[in-house]
Amino acid sequence: MDFALTPDQEAVREGVVALCSGFDDAYWHGCDKAHEFPHAFHKAIAEAGYLGICIPEEYGGSGLGIHDAAIMMEAISGSGAGMTGASAIHMNIFGLNPVVVFGTEEQKARFLPPLVRGEEKACFGVTEPTTGLDTTRLKTRAVRKGDKYIVDGQKVWISTAQVADRILLLARTTPLDQVSKPTEGLSLFYTKLDRDRARVVEIDKMGRAGVDSNEIFFEGYEVPAEDRIGEEGKGFRYILHGMNPERVLIGAEAIGLGRAALARAAGYAKERVVFGRPIGQNQGVQHPLAADWMALEAAWLMVQNAAWRYDQDLDCAAQANAGKYLAAEAGLKACQNAIMTHGGFGYAREYHVERYMREAMIPWIAPVSPNLILCHIAERVLGLPKSY
């Protein structure tokens, strides 16, 4: 067992840290305040070749694994970019895995290089307002008519849909009452997102204002049949290939954010003098921060375990879910304690930790709630009866 990073992983981390040093907290504060997508950051990441970290080399990528990507995303978030920086590229890192695995050679050649070069941005169109995590009950329909599909329905919580050029869209092509089991009859498409034909409405939310979240309304939206990924009706199985990597990356991002908050808290505790001594000399300040460090380190080990298992083609569902759970809990707690360490100043935007905490809610809630992760572990690992 070797816990050391490989030379390639060290190079990835060092390169990303160096790149992110050009985007300080003032930059991310500005994106958040102006509700402005970090285009300059996205461009820099693309030009450095990091958008294609997991894309096969024959399509312009680096052909590295999810473990490498997790190291990159932790470094991005930990630079102070938080979920704004991570979410700006998150979908591009893991989201097209179904295209890589199940797409035709023509589709891969058409779709992947523009994404790697940063010429196109993608969003993930699965969640719906009335189904939540019950993906098999999606109501968005795609009906085949000749060489195209006609899509009608609604999606919600679709990140980057204000700037995305394409959408990975899951829709029902066979009605639920006509399939033998609910997981059948869903089809996956990777197609252009035309905001002149689909209505995209931004959601005003708590944090990460620099990366938009949206509702999308499709009405008679035409999708070329050549944009369907794999077989009709098999989309649910295809989309599963992206779920464990997403949990790994979300976990890595939560850890980076928690570490950024912890670093600011420790720095402030050393400098802030009250009653003639640094507040960091008090155990009441020290101990929560020390506990945060331990929790973040432990969660990072679980996230890396899940990433390694995925890259080795081993089952990693339990580890990916556990890693996401532990990382989100540790990251959120570190952000809360960073605010408490700063006292009243922690509530002020200029100290940045309040932005970190608002963003830390994202990996805690999404893409799967901590409650359902506990249900998954109870059922799939411990063999307990399904509770829902």
Language model region names:
Residues 1-80, 89, 102-107, 114-119, ...:
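Alpha-helical interface subdomain recognition
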Residues 92-102:
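Helix-loop "lid/cap" segments that line or gate small-molecule binding pockets
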Residues 118-126, 170:
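A short, Trp-centered hydrophobic/proline-enriched beta-strand micro-motif
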Residues 49, 72-77, 171-173, 191-196, ...:
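Short Ser/Thr-interspersed hydrophobic loop/turn segments at strand-loop and sheet-helix junctions
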Residues 147-148, 152-199:
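A short core secondary-structure module
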Residues 137, 194-222:
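Flexible, small-/acidic-enriched active-site or ligand-binding loops
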Residues 129-139:
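Active-site-adjacent elements of ketosynthase-type condensing enzymes
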Residues 220-238:
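Long, acidic (Asp/Glu-rich), low-complexity accessory segments flanking structured domains
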